[in-house]
Amino acid sequence: MLPGFLLMLGLSILYVEANLATHLDQLFYGLKAAVGALVARAVVRLASSFITDVPLALLAVAGFALTLFASASFVLVLVGAGLAYELWTNGERWVGHANSLSPAALVLVLLLGAVTISLSAQIFLEGLKAGLLTFGGAYTVIPFLQQASVDHHHWLTDSQFIDGLAIGGVLPAPLIIFSTFVGYLAGGLSGGLLMTLGIFLPAFVFPIFLHRYLVGIAENPRVRPFLLGVTAGVVGLIAAVTVQILDTSVVDVYTAILAVAAFAVLYRLHGKLTVLYVVLGCGAIGAVLQATVV
């Protein structure tokens, strides 16, 4: 993890100080198309695994629409989807036990969101909230950080956010390391460190101090419908962000073809290095296209 963090931090510094995006514009032309395909593949995989009935599908569609067209709060979409599916599954029991159906992480995120603080603390807390809400891995962090850093705080543009994802896709580290890039652009070196710390802190603290409690929640039949609903909301959120990413990264017929081809390869092949090869391949092809055709 440390090598990936240091690489991302170094590239983030170059991105800002050496205007890397301008110098590597031809490379990013294809890389961004690959990012759209990568996130789209995550949506398909999550949906095929967790959307198992019509109500869950409807909740995913609702989460997609609310996020894309109404800019609804990430947390409210997830809580709403969870409560809606709980009501659908166990309406009468829910009325009698409503207070037991609010997972601590979601409540904590709502409280954290109400605090007015300095920039450094904001960066850390946005990372912490993203870490607390990592349903489904790194891909769930993408819509949350996109909403927080681009739409709410305006630390980055959509294009810069996608650049960060593209860089993260080629590093020898989990994709979630792109959060270091977001933090650096938001607040410099300290911002990169604080965002990364916030993201990864729950992953270290929860297993050590809250493992038994979290396992109990996951295995509790009363809570399971809520968590299934939350997962459906996550699918909708990531789908909405996929559309936003593609809207920014697919700028012509060539990038559209690259995105479709990248999605097809990612969907069919599941090797450990597939993502790296696809992202680098799209970057190289895009650079050639920019130099010769576009």
PLM segments and residue spans:
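Multi-pass membrane proteins that catalyze or facilitate reactions on polyprenyl-/lipid-phosphate substrates
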Residues: M1-L171, L175-V294
